[in-house]
Amino acid sequence: VASSPEKRDKYIRTIYNKANDMDRLINELTFYSKIDTNKIPYTFSKINVANYFRDCVEEVGLELEARGIELGYFNFVDEDVMVIADAEQMKRVINNIIGNSLKYMDKKNGIINIRILDVGDFVQVEIEDNGKGIGQKELPYIFDRFYRTDSSRNSSKGGSGIGLSIVKKIIEDHGGKIWATSKLGIGTEIHFVL
């Protein structure tokens, strides 16, 4: 079938990429199944908000910098503010949201801003990007299991439609809530409260 080394290499790359996509999908489905049936035990502890999110930003900052994405971090909570949370699962939340931002970033000069706000008895986290945005009729469904917007279904971006539903489940299991605002061509903001 492969009449040249170039074609063979192309086929091998395609097979490799599809196998990786399948592996990622299986892992997401397995995790979602466990979290949906409450089989993932949470390890809740007191977390210093400022330190935790500073560390998260440092971790994702290297990858974003390598991709040419500008990362802004704005902490508006006092240094001693604490929340009760599962640090590992909150990291999954941050990574899934930023992963989505990266996947649908359509600007040459991509920007992701993370803001931490004190809203009375709660901490609100906002992750904003300047990607392609989400249409208003699709916005209410982005946290639904397996939902993908029309534009993402017709793209080569991959994705299973599970990532943001995992994020929602984790936030709700923490007693919080999550929502999104977006403007087509301008970007999306994901907000959650703990």
Task: Please identify what each model-predicted range represents.
Residues 3, 37-42, 80-85:
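Conserved micro-motifs of the catalytic ATP-binding
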Residues 17-22:
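Short alpha-helical segment of the dimerization/phosphotransfer core of two-component systems
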Residues 111-121:
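Short beta-strand/loop element within the Bergerat-fold HATPase_c
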Residues 129:
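Acidic ATP/Mg2+-coordinating residue in the GHKL
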Residues 134-148:
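Short conserved segment of the HATPase_c
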Residues 43-61, 116:
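A conserved beta-strand-to-alpha-helix junction within the catalytic ATP-binding
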Residues 175-176:
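Conserved glycine-rich
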